[in-house]
Amino acid sequence: MTRTVHDPNTDGLDDDLIGRLGPRIEPRPVGGRATGFDPAQRVAMAEAVLRAMSMTGPFARLVMLTGHGSTTVNNPHASGLDCGACGGHTGEANARVAAAILNDPDVRVALRQRGIDIPDDTVFLGCLHDTTTDVIRLFDIEQLPASHADDLRRLRALLAKATSLTRLERAALLGIARGAATEQQVVTRSRDWAQVRPEWGLAGNASFIAAPRARTRGIDLGGRSFLHDYDWQQDKDFGTLQLIMTAPMVVASWINLQYYGSTVNNAAFGAGNKVLHNVVGTLGVLEGNAGDLKVGLPWQSVHDGSRFVHEPLRLTVLIEAPLEAINGVIAKNDIVRELVDHHWLHLYAISPQGRVSHAYRGHLLWQQLEERSEP
C-alpha cells in the first residue's frame, strides 16, 4: 500500500518481457482450481462484449481494447485511481483476455454464424491507458503479423500525438505552467513519493450517456462524462440495455456518490487529510494515530488547496432507448429502481432525433420536456 515503485512484481524487468507476461485463456488447473475458458465460453463472451459495445462492424485492421489504470507511488489510495469496475485494479487483464478471445480463429467462425463477421485482417490489441501519465501501453504486439507493421507505426504516431496533447490539457488542471518541461512534470508526479495529488482521478464526474457515439462526437464534455456507445435498434430483447443499467450505470453512480460525499462532508464520508494517514495492515487508513478506519476519498482528491476541484452533483444519466424498455429494466432490478426512485441520480431519455425528450419522475412515470427552438 505504500510501495515506492509502481509495480514491485515487475520492477526491473525488461519492458518487452513485461509485455509478453500476460493472462492465458486456455483451460488449465492452477492451484487446484480451473482457469481459462472453454470454446463455448469464449464464443459467448466474444459476442456479449461486441454487442455490449455496439461493435458489430465494420471493423478496422487494428482495434484497440483499452483498459485504464494509474501509476503512483507511496499512495495508500492508489486503487482509487484504478478501475472501479475492476474492483480497484487496472483493466489490463480484461483488455488482454478480450483481445485474445476475439483473435481466436475458431471464435470468429462461430461469430459469423451469429451475424458478426470480423475480417481475417482485423487484429484486436489489448491496451492500457495510464491516466496519470497518459501513456498508452500496447500488449502482445509481437503477435501482430508483418502485414500490420505500417498500421502499428501509424497507430504509435497518433498515440504519441494524443498523449502530448492530453498531457498539456492535464497540466492546466494540475497547476503546471506551460513550458518546455510541462510534459515531463506531468510524468514526474507519478514517481514523486511526496506527491499527494498525482492526478485528479474522476473528480468532476457529472453525467453518464448511453447513446450512439454520433450524439456526442465533436462535443467537449470537459472530461466529466461516462460514455457508452449504445444503439438500441441493434439490441435484441434489450439485453445490452439491462447490462448497461445494472452494471456500469450503477458503478458510475457509486463513484459519483463517493466523490459527492467526500466533497460535501469529508469528515463523515471522506478520508480526511492524506498527509496525516497511517496505514492499518492492508485494511485501510487512520487519520493520525487513533480513531476509526476512514472511508471515502481524502481531501486532496477533491480539493487543490484553495478550491474544490469536484463539483458535488448527483449523476445525470441520459439513455437513448424507448421509455418502455428503460422502464422494463427499472421494474425488474431492485438496485436500479432504488437509485432512480429515491433520486440518487437524475434519469433522462433521448429521443430517436437526438433530443433530451423525457425526465424520469419516479415509479415508472416520465415527464415530457418542452422542445426549445434554436435561436
Regions found by a protein language model. Name each.
Residues I25-L62, G69-A149, D220-L221, Q234-L241:
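Catalytic or ion-translocation cores adjacent to nucleophile or general acid/base/metal-coordination motifs
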Residues I18-T35, L173-A181:
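Intrinsically disordered, low-complexity linkers and terminal tails enriched in Pro/Gly
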